[in-house]
Amino acid sequence: MKKILFIDRDGTLVEEPFDFQVDSLDKIKLTSGVIPALLQLQKAGFTFIMVSNQNGIGTVAFPEEDFAVCHEFILDLFSSQGILFDEIFICPHTPEDNCICRKPKTGLLESYLKETAFAKQYSWVIGDRDTDKEFADNLGVNFLPISKTHTWEMVASAIINDARKASVQRKTKETAVDLSVQLDSDQTSVIDTPIPFFTHMLEQVAKHGGFDLRLQASGDLEVDEHHLIEDTAIALGEAIRTALGDKWGINRYGYTLPMDESLATIAIDISGRSFCDFKGQFTREFIGGMATEMIPHFFQSLSSALGATIHIEVTGINHHHMIEACFKVLGRALRQACSRTNNYLPSTKGVL
């Protein structure tokens, strides 16, 4: 579904003039940073809808032609930079008219909202007034202000980072896993499991994946470590899949080939289809309190929850290094596959 930014005009896209009316070309000045911010957001797959109150268009105080000349000039400015608005909604009334279309009311968008499916959790209103915040509440979407202390650069960063995070709580009779990921954050991850070696491996995934991972996991180790490792992999896959959202603009594919005395290769396709092929032989039963048979099972569980095809092969002598190489290459491949470098969905089907 669409991710929509409902954007105010005066005071948000262009500076608000002293008399609060853009009726001549010499009053038009773009707000600082608006062009690069909108280009970033457009690349991230957002649809732009302009929604603006314009007091008294068509009156003596605000002739229709004065509005039209300025409005078309503003649209041409943005269009010249590759920024397009899918729809534009203008309320021409004054507050005294008590119309149903003036923000914060939503009447202006009634038909559009009925005909358009969009993801409310990933959609925002951006504006400079309290009425824009009320408008966002009435639409059931998020809100971010534009002001001298809250710039377009900050708005773009907040939206892009927020759009790529997710939390999963997985509680069963055997385990309790509380996990969150933020794909575009390089904060130091905080990971706590009762198996130090497993914790260390997950730290490698987050570090080399370039994302923030917060994890608190516990389980029935008195039975064995199977349930804990499996459920953690499932939660991690679910969180990354959710954080990717509609996968607009991602690379989709990831592959890497790092070496020490061990060699691990991996290829990932975040296609929505689960398949895992793990090739590697471990002659030791346990490494750091973790059964080596759980290594391929971790990748299989991750593949299933993430909806990804994973091919991985590892060879070497030192089993610690072999396993660590597997988790490091997983992180590097996820970093590559989840990176947003395109302005399209990488699938001829139109969905991933």
Swiss-Prot record:
Mg(2+) binds at D8, D10, D128. Keywords: Amino-acid biosynthesis, Cytoplasm, Histidine biosynthesis, Hydrolase, Lyase, Magnesium, Metal-binding, Multifunctional enzyme, Zinc. Residues 164-352 are annotated as: Imidazoleglycerol-phosphate dehydratase. SUPFAM superfamilies: HAD-like, Ribosomal protein S5 domain 2-like. Its cofactor is Mg(2+); Zn(2+). One of its GO terms (biological process) is L-histidine biosynthetic process. Pathway: Amino-acid biosynthesis; L-histidine biosynthesis; L-histidine from 5-phospho-alpha-D-ribose 1-diphosphate: step 6/9; Amino-acid biosynthesis; L-histidine biosynthesis; L-histidine from 5-phospho-alpha-D-ribose 1-diphosphate: step 8/9. Zn(2+) binds at C91, H93, C99, C101. Its EC number is 3.1.3.15, 4.2.1.19. The active site is at D8 (nucleophile), D10 (proton donor). It is found in: Cytoplasm. PANTHER family: IMIDAZOLEGLYCEROL-PHOSPHATE DEHYDRATASE, IMIDAZOLEGLYCEROL-PHOSPHATE DEHYDRATASE HIS7. In the N-terminal section; belongs to the histidinol-phosphatase family. In the C-terminal section; belongs to the imidazoleglycerol-phosphate dehydratase family. This is Histidine biosynthesis bifunctional protein HisB. It comes from Legionella pneumophila (strain Lens).
